[in-house]
């Protein structure tokens, strides 16, 4: 992969209210997501899917992060977290667990911010358990509001996601956060 392409796989470090200084990991191409949220800052979802796919190689993602980490060290910038906050849903990446394991070699905590859509899957929970900090999105407690706000992939079921979040809480040893977009119906 060319340097210009590698540079698109990570960004920062940037200030984060929750994570201090974080270096963003962009493991998903733009707008590949399992949701099409009405409030998405990235615009319309281009590829709505729930199939986990290989988007980039683990080596390319790690090399991109390494380049940014080295550049930050040269500037005496601290990095508190390597944060998976891509332009789509990070758990759609079938290599997420391997990427987290490979990035741990830098000695920096790993965070993943997810819309929780695939948390019902055991393989996704297993991958997320390798991170140090995970945030899962909860925008609605009813199927009607959930579809209205998050416009989820039609094959997803809110009950499965809610159960998966409960299962994940009992399996995960790190810091577990949730985030919610409040809206007026």
Language-model-derived ranges and their functions:
Residues 27, 84-86, 180-182:
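Short glycine-centered, acidic/aromatic-flanked micro-motifs in structured strand/loop junctions
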Residues 17-60:
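Canonical Radical SAM [4Fe-4S] cluster-binding loop centered on the CxxxCxxC motif
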Residues 1-21, 59-63, 70:
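Auxiliary Fe-S-binding modules of radical SAM enzymes
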Residues 43-83, 98:
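Conserved alpha-helical substructure of the radical SAM core
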Residues 91-185:
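Conserved AdoMet/S-adenosylmethionine-binding subsite of the radical SAM
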Residues 30, 47, 89-90, 183:
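Short strand->helix junction
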């Amino acid at each position: 992969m060319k340097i210009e392409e590698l540079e698109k796989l990570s960004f920062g470090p940037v200030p984060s209210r929750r994570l201090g200084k974080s270096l963003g990991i962009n493991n998903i191409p733009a707008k590949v997501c399992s949701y099409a949220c009405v409030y998405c800052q990235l615009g319309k979802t281009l590829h709505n899917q729930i199939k986990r796919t290989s988007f980039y190689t683990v080596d390319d993602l790690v090399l991109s992060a390494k380049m940014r980490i080295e550049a930050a060290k040269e500037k005496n910038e601290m990095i508190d977290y390597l944060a998976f906050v891509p332009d789509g849903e990070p758990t759609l990446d079938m290599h997420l667990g391997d990427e987290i394991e490979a990035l741990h070699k830098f000695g920096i905590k790993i965070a993943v911010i997810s819309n929780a859509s695939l948390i019902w899957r055991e393989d996704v929970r297993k991958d997320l358990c390798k991170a140090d900090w995970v945030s899962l999105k909860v925008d609605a407690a009813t199927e009607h509001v959930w579809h209205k706000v998050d416009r989820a992939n039609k094959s997803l079921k809110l009950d499965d996601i809610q159960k998966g979040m409960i299962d994940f809480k009992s399996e995960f040893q790190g810091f577990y956060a949730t985030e919610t977009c409040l809206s007026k119906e």
